[in-house]
Amino acid sequence: MTGAAAMPTVLIVPGLRDHVDAHWQTLLAMELRARHRNVCVVAPMGRGDLDCAARVRAIECHAQAIEGPLVLVAHSGGCLMVAHWAQRSKRPVHGALLATPPDFEQPMPAGYPTIDALRASGWLPVPRQPLPFPILVAASRDDPLGSYERIEALANDWGSRVVDLGHVGHLNPASGYGHWGRADTLIDEISAGAAQTRVARA
């Protein structure tokens, strides 16, 4: 990666989980900081309170506190948080990496929120308008929280290019991740596009 001064700040948006030391987003934040990259993390809010609006406010609070260009890196339910936030916020964003968004419109496995609970908490309907900034949706071929075909259709509605990750489950520790090395490449791709946009406008 290039120097922090030339690159956007990375804002990491977790899904419906608590803090997990072994999660790739946790490890990514540590790695970025070790490389002197500007990074902020929206604190995980667990599943005890599913209020979507509270999570959208948390993204907005962090985004508005960051000066300069911004890239979002979201996972799972965090991807849908970003979609809801993008409908409400005027904060410019240079790009977003949305990794394995879940399909909240279909029943999920036991232990995950029900459709009724998600609707009552403001997650449904899922926003399907094009997002107002460039995005990459990284989708899994065997995600237990959403079929590849339905996530691909959602990504198309958002105006996103789809990155086929192959068989990576839900890209979480239960699926063997851990460190996710490809995140670096995809973040660099989004960040480089942001830098090129700034040069073109100069």
Which residues fall in each region the model found?
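Residue in the alpha/beta-hydrolase core beta-strand immediately N-terminal to the catalytic nucleophile
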Residues: 71, 94-97
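Conserved hydrolase catalytic core segment
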Residues: 84-95, 104
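Short beta-strand/loop motif that positions the catalytic acidic residue
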Residues: 130-139, 143
